[in-house]
Amino acid sequence: MVYQPASGARDLLPLDVEKKRWIEDRLQQVFHRWGYHRIITSTLERMDTLMAGEAIQRQMVIQLQNGEDDELGLRPELTASIARTVVTRMANATYPQRLYYNANVFRRTWESRHNRQQEFYQAGVELLGAGGLLANAEVLLLVADCLAALGLRQWHLILGEAGITRSLLSAFPANLQDKVRSAIAHLDRITIDTLPLSDKLRDRAQIIMDLRGPSADVLQKVSSLDLDEEQREAVNNLKSLVELLESEKKFPLILDLSLIQTIDYYTGIVFEVVNDTESQARVLGRGGRYDQLLGLYHPQRENIPGIGFGLSIEDLYQVLLSTQQLPQVTPASNYLVVPETGSANAAAFAYAQKLRDSTDLVRVEIDLGGRDAEAIRQYARDRSIAQIAWIKADSSPKIESLR
């Protein structure tokens, strides 16, 4: 019998881990430079936490039983868990709170393909307790800084506004809004044509789908619609954000007011980061504003504004493979310490520790015996170990360089 990982799970070998860490370390440096602090939340959540506000679909969650009455699930994303943590464990925190994470998430998939991946890695931020123009701009510019730190230049950001889109959908019959919303989210014009809508509403749905393109064109189109005062204010806020992003340098921006995320807790801007270098566009990350989510967990139902994003480590990895930036080998040890006789064993361990105690990172292995001198040298060459320290019976080292 060959033992395999669970369906949808996978193992990361040392070189895979090095590549993953290369990405994560560079993102973490950016998060630190922007003043964000890491938060780690539980992988396992109560289902009522994950389902609060019905923003997350139950079928997305991999559920577990703990032998009691509690329904438990593996987190399918991080924002809900962080929202719960902040309002229940950080009640006296000062705002804004700048938090970042680097963690795995689990999502059930219902595709027929065997072993469809269900565990994913994400890195992202949550900016809590700040609403408005500057907070929105900070998060979008932080996205750009993250991609620059990874050496990625060919990408664009698709920016929508969930509040505007939701208000434009309010004109549709209540029993059809979910279907219209889903059709618009998937740019599914065929479904729109088959729904029992009046010609006016069908045209409205098609117009919403067409609110995509260069920012100036989309803002002009949406401004020409029959908008109420609240909708017009949201459009003006979006215009101010676009102007700020594009004020100093060209920000690769596409406005898309048909953009709807499958996780439905967003109340303001929503966005996707898309890679431009492949024939098929690859979404590298998603995010948006969620000003009512924290209120679902707050004991007094107090709303605290929030905005954040998550970047997919897997998708970044796939894009970076072609750039040759990722590590090609695991780091080699600097020394192989070899006791020449049994009486030199203690001295070998002591010498190896002396090397490890250096202020610089020095990787040191101890030879564990069972090989002659030539086999030891071959092992060191195979592992790209630069130097062998032969420890004599009198504890003195003899350094042999293999380069």
From Swiss-Prot:
The UniProt record lists the keyword Translocase: no
Subcellular location: Cytoplasm
One Pfam family here: tRNA-synt_His
Main location per the UniProt record: cytoplasm
A biological-process GO annotation: L-histidine biosynthetic process
Alphabetical UniProt keywords: Amino-acid biosynthesis, Cytoplasm, Histidine biosynthesis
Gene Ontology MF annotations: histidine-tRNA ligase activity
One cellular component term from this protein's GO annotations in UniProt: cytoplasm
Superkingdom of source: Bacteria
Annotated NCBIfam families: hisZ_biosyn_reg, PRK12292.2-3
Remaining remarks: This function is generally fulfilled by the C-terminal part of HisG, which is missing in some bacteria such as this one.
Family: Belongs to the class-II aminoacyl-tRNA synthetase family. HisZ subfamily.
Protein name according to UniProt: ATP phosphoribosyltransferase regulatory subunit
Organism: Nostoc punctiforme (strain ATCC 29133 / PCC 73102)
Gene: hisZ
